[in-house]
UniProtKB/Swiss-Prot annotation:
Organism, as annotated: Cupriavidus necator (strain ATCC 17699 / DSM 428 / KCTC 22496 / NCIMB 10442 / H16 / Stanier 337)
Keyword annotations of the record: Cell outer membrane, Disulfide bond, Lipoprotein, Membrane, Palmitate, Signal
Membrane topology, record value: Lipid-anchor
Intracellular or extracellular location(s): Cell outer membrane
Record gene name: mliC
This protein's name: Membrane-bound lysozyme inhibitor of C-type lysozyme
SUPFAM superfamilies xref list: YdhA-like
């Protein structure tokens, strides 16, 4: 009688069930808003012109992206919008535009030709 292969299969099934439960538990713990989960969260610190810095937390899911940062101590939640190039986030009066490792923050209440609120922001490791 061959009980070893059956026992090995039973162990494999138990292991897969455990891994599946762990993955489901991780997805359930991922931050989210109204049922939209963001399994990919990363923080990036930028060094900008004038010695200014900006810390941004990016929340990514397959269909939704958001960025959270603070301006004058107040949190800004910006969501991704259509962009011809790079990633563009808009929240409140601010627009955060990134391309590669560089970003620019604009205050949309200022004139269109006004200097950015933060310019030449470079991601720091």
């Amino acid at each position: 009688m061959t009980t070893r292969p059956i026992l090995s299969c039973a162990r494999a099934v138990a292991l897969l069930a455990t891994l599946g439960a762990c993955a489901a538990a991780h997805a359930a713990r991922a931050p989210g808003i109204d049922g939209v989960r963001f399994p990919d969260v990363r923080a990036v610190r930028y060094q900008c012109d004038g010695g200014k810095t900006l810390s941004v937390r990016y929340f990514n899911s397959p269909d939704n992206q958001a960025a959270v940062f603070r301006i004058d101590g107040k949190p800004v939640l910006a969501v991704s919008t259509v962009s011809a190039s790079g990633a563009r986030y808009a929240g409140g009066r601010y627009e955060w535009w990134t391309k590669g490792e560089e970003g620019t923050l604009r205050d949309l209440m200022q004139a269109e030709n006004a200097a950015p609120a933060l310019a030449n922001c470079q991601a720091k490791p």
